[in-house]
A protein has these predicted regions:
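Extracytoplasmic copper-binding redox domains, predominantly the cupredoxin/blue-copper superfamily
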Residues: 21-151
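Positively charged n-region of N-terminal signal peptides that target proteins for export
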Residues: 1-4
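Bacterial N-terminal signal peptides
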Residues: 7-17
Length: 151
């Protein structure tokens, strides 16, 4: 009987699909001042998995979020001023976003979903953004530098 139960358990483990892990929820604060100085997203880098949700939460007035570079096939997104905004990230890749009123102060961030399949395309597009960053322009390279390579 014990052998039968062990065989049955093994067979079920092989046959039945693995239960997918529940999607994670990430919160990104939009701040006038944070640990990295003025006009920041906190955290400025999020590592997520496909299906996770990201909620941007303004903690001060005059902030909103807009995507700048997203994986191929993903629709760009833009929130309303001073309102929380949630996006579900379904495709692997790097998502670069910013706060339009504070772009010149390099209020930018990165979401990495799974493997960074579009990292080179994001880097190329980011170069076009660089001249608009009047202050704290190093934040762009710092954010991109946090992206972990595909494994």
């Amino acid at each position: 009987m014990k052998r039968f139960l062990m065989t049955l358990a093994t067979a079920l483990a092989v046959i039945l699909p693995a239960t997918p892990s529940p999607a994670a929820e990430h919160k990104i604060l939009m701040l006038n001042y944070g640990k990295d100085g003025g006009m920041v997203f906190e955290p400025s880098y999020v590592k997520a998995e496909p299906g996770d949700t990201i909620t941007f939460v303004p903690q001060n007035s005059s902030h909103y979020v807009q995507s700048y570079a997203v994986p191929e096939g993903v629709s760009p997104w833009k929130s309303k001023l001073d309102e929380a905004f949630t996006v579900t990230v379904e495709k692997e890749g790097v998502y670069l976003y910013y706060c339009p009123p504070h772009l010149m102060m390099a209020m930018i961030g990165i979401i990495q979903v799974g493997k960074p399949v579009n990292l080179e395309a994001v880097r190329q597009k980011a170069e076009k953004l660089r001249p608009k960053l009047v202050m704290k322009s190093e934040r762009l390279e710092t954010a991109l530098g946090q992206v972990t390579p595909a494994q």
